[in-house]
């Protein structure tokens, strides 16, 4: 989660929210950043000072509960309940209900998580949970899921204190 400052978006965030999605109002064309031209910025949590992400931001919201429940139900093979939760969430955003099943349902849940939780620190864990590569846009470097940096090192005192704990590879 960003603690302070305005976060620049890549066009991927912009493209998936700019149409009929009310979340498009949370993005603006910002200032020039590091000579890269004007950037798209997320203004989701504006502070009284006028800066994004300068004040306390929500830790959990109703939308997260809907999407967590949708994903959990999908994983429990209860696609009907997953679809109900997903459509309840979409209704809160003024989006039309969908009728999906199988992998298409999971992909829609993950897409809504991508849009809803932009700049809140969720995407990394969503990608990690499903073993998907992490695409970094600044600098333009990709981190494959097999890269040892996907997992942080376990504190050495924990490894030393428990013979059943093995240090994550690469550390």
Set out the residue ranges of the language-model regions.
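Acidic/polar-rich alpha-helix caps and helix-coil junctions
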Residues: 1-171
């Amino acid at each position: 989660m960003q603690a302070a400052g305005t976060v620049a978006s890549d066009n991927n965030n912009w493209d998936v929210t700019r149409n009929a999605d009310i979340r498009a109002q949370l993005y603006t064309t910002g200032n020039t950043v590091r000579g890269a031209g004007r950037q798209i910025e997320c203004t989701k949590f504006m502070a009284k000072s006028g800066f994004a992400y300068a004040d306390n931001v929500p830790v959990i919201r109703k939308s997260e509960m809907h999407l967590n429940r949708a994903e959990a139900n999908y994983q429990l093979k209860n696609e009907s309940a997953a679809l109900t939760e997903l459509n309840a969430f979409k209704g809160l955003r003024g989006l039309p209900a969908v009728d999906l099943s199988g992998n298409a349902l999971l992909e829609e849940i993950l897409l809504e998580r991508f849009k809803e939780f932009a700049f809140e620190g969720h995407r990394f864990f969503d990608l990690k949970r499903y073993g998907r590569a992490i695409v970094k846009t600044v600098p333009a470097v990709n981190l494959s899921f097999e890269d040892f940096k996907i997992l942080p090192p376990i504190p050495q005192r924990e490894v030393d204190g428990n013979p059943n704990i093995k240090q994550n590879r690469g550390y």
